[in-house]
Amino acid sequence: MNMTWRTALVASVAALGIGSQAAHAQQTVKATLRSDAIQLEPHDVKAGKVTFDVANSADNNMAHELVVLKTNLADGALPVRKGEVLEERLHKIGEVEDVASGRHKRVTLTLAPGRYAVICNKPGHYAAGMHATLVVSR
């Protein structure tokens, strides 16, 4: 009887450990950079480590980038000067620079709950529509 109780206790503790690991599992967001848009799949994730798999699928030979900004502003309402978002006025979490046409790059960031604007900040690209919103929940 004692052995059965211990076995159940060990199994319960092991299950709790597995559950907490699953809660902190790394997530991936596929970010597709087009000529005039950024498509995110999914648009919402849980807080923690998130890997952005960034692909430049633009129909031209332009390099793009992906900048992740924590902000309560709408992704289309960020402060801009001379065709670029003023990143220094916002909380930049990380970025992937210079993704050539037809190429992929990855970056892993730790994201807290909140709203994030995901943008390309090459001159003129944000104004052309290269922005999206990512929502991070607990």
Segments (PLM) and residue ranges:
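Extracytoplasmic beta-sandwich strand-turn segments characteristic of Greek-key/jelly-roll folds
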Residues: L73-L111
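Cleavable N-terminal signal peptides
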Residues: A11-S12, A23
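Sec/Tat signal peptide C-region and signal peptidase I cleavage site
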Residues: G19-A25
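Bacterial N-terminal signal peptides that target proteins for export
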Residues: M1-V10
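Beta-strand cores of secreted/periplasmic/IMS beta-sandwich domains, seen most often
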Residues: E41-M62, L66-V68, K105-V118
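Short edge-strand/loop segments of extracellular domains
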Residues: L69-D75, V136-R138
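Extracellular/periplasmic metallocenter environments
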Residues: E97-R138
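N-terminal edge beta-strand
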Residues: Q26-K49
